């Protein structure tokens, strides 16, 4: 299909450095033309931070670009190739319904991938139609923006455009295209792909590109590829700890969904935990709980081991020595993760300094929450506000004992109680994207064309650490249900 190149002053300043890699890494592909694009959502704060032109983006020409009907003159649309371990099984993948337009360079020199998701078939579609449904695209928009507001590294959503098409899933659904913004779309699965089907020279090209893109200081190191591995391990240790601290369950931690940049990607079957339970699973296809909340750190370590395996030819010419180097690096993950998690949990309890018994204090609270079915977010919200009469734990012997120990712990630090409360307020969100509130917003938007519910939800989620009466509606738990909440891989 011939590309419809245009010059439209959207503010996009595109380069195409990924296209300079060997062609094994991508296939050039034009977006499919869609019949009737309409703008559903536009992310004005993100537009401002990227210094794009909102007025042009919401014009007919701008919407055509967001829909893939027109292509910016500097763009080189391409589908990226990658592989991945899905639920532990290795398979060939690739962008089956997404196209990278290029990399937007901000006036400050920052580089961001601009990707259209749901833009049509590619050579990696594996029999799929390359399309996306409106509901899952709006869901990714909501959750990714909530994650960003929570301070968790994430891909962002610039816009959602409806296509005017009906796509066939279990039923007919309205089609949509999401414009995703990311530090990059390089994945552990990208390295697995070239490790399996490429040459060592092509592997080195990807590693060098990744260093240049994300870890430039690595060039000066004695072993740049070891530095690359170590930095990715650090970033993932920080990321997974942040997930755990807010009760986020990704749901599909396949290696193709682990970014080298350390951003959260793919919001298909994700959800936030209500009642605290380490075995929490939302994904309808995760029947054995591989990606349960409590197992996410272990899965991250497993994924990183797969990444390390791909780098073995670059780490040392001696295979045995390369394995030792990789194993030593991977062994650091558990300690790095635990340090990040403990630091975050101390902050959630208003604790500034370290004591050896802190971990026991934290684990005891979590155990009590699990025993009595206490809501994860609201328990910390209640401890922060001081209204402990609002928690189901009040009056439980274990909690009353724990609460006394916690108060004693706070007295053993120099910082004031006011300082502790301020630390807790900045560490414990008052509002998260509760599953029932997200579904409420999606139903209004998709079925009724009413985006006001979603707009109000997004406004609340943009201020997660604001403790106000306006947030109360979004902090309420769902009504008891006989059916556990389930998510699906729609995105």
From Swiss-Prot:
Its EC number is 2.7.7.-, 2.7.7.108. InterPro entries: SelO (IPR003846). The active site is at residue 256. Mg(2+) binds at residues 257, 266. ATP binds at residues 94, 96-97, 117, 129-130, 180, 187, 266. It comes from the Bacteria. One of its GO terms (molecular function) is AMPylase activity. The keyword GTP-binding does not apply. Belongs to the SELO family. Nucleotidyltransferase involved in the post-translational modification of proteins. It can catalyze the addition of adenosine monophosphate (AMP) or uridine monophosphate (UMP) to a protein, resulting in modifications known as AMPylation and UMPylation. HAMAP family: YdiU_SelO. This is Protein nucleotidyltransferase YdiU. It comes from Clostridium botulinum (strain Loch Maree / Type A3). The gene is ydiU.
